[in-house]
């Protein structure tokens, strides 16, 4: 084999190895979502290693929204959430059908945390978030939060 062919063959094998590594690294990760002490926490499990990779206060939250798929849904999403500056994807699959976004204000930037909850977690998250949001607005405005833009 000529030297050029050997280099091409080596690059091909290196590319295949890198692709396999990235595929295993990101698609074999399992995400666990928790509500803990008023925070939304995301844990990533890769093999036997469990790492906390995200923890944000529910007080910074703006909305929990199902991710849009159609053009009409995308327009409605833009109306509700506005211009999102940052996005962090904590979904278990590459193209999730039932992904949700926890939209929050992070250091003055509107940010999305994408996650793929089961129905039970989603229901609990929505209830806890609504309570935390209501209490936070009471702290800010000293009433039931009706005077703020929720």
Question: What do these predicted ranges mean?
Answer:
Residues 1-29, 149-150:
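Alpha-helical transmembrane spans
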Residues 3, 95-150:
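Terminal and domain-flanking low-complexity segments
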Residues 4-5, 9, 41-52, 108-111, ...:
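Short N-terminal helix-initiation segments at or just after the protein's N-terminus
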Residues 21-57:
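Conserved beta-hairpin
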Residues 38, 45, 61, 67, ...:
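Generic structural motif
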Residues 42-82:
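Phosphoinositide-binding peripheral membrane targeting modules
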Residues 72-104:
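Hydrophobic alpha-helical transmembrane segments and immediately flanking/interface helices
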């Amino acid at each position: 084999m000529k030297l050029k062919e050997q280099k091409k063959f080596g690059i091909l094998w290196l590319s295949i190895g890198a692709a396999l590594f990235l595929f295993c690294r990101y698609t074999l990760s399992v995400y666990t979502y928790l509500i803990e002490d008023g925070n939304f926490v995301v844990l990533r499990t890769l093999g036997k290693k469990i790492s906390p990779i995200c923890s944000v206060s529910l007080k910074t939250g703006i909305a929990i929204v199902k991710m849009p798929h159609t053009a009409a849904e995308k327009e409605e999403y833009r109306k509700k959430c506005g211009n999102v500056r940052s996005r962090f994807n904590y979904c278990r699959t590459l193209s999730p059908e039932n992904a949700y976004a926890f939209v929050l204000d992070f250091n003055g930037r509107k940010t999305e945390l994408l996650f793929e909850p089961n129905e039970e977690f989603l229901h609990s998250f929505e209830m806890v978030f609504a309570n935390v949001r209501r209490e936070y607005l009471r702290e800010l405005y000293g009433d039931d939060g009706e005077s703020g833009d929720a």
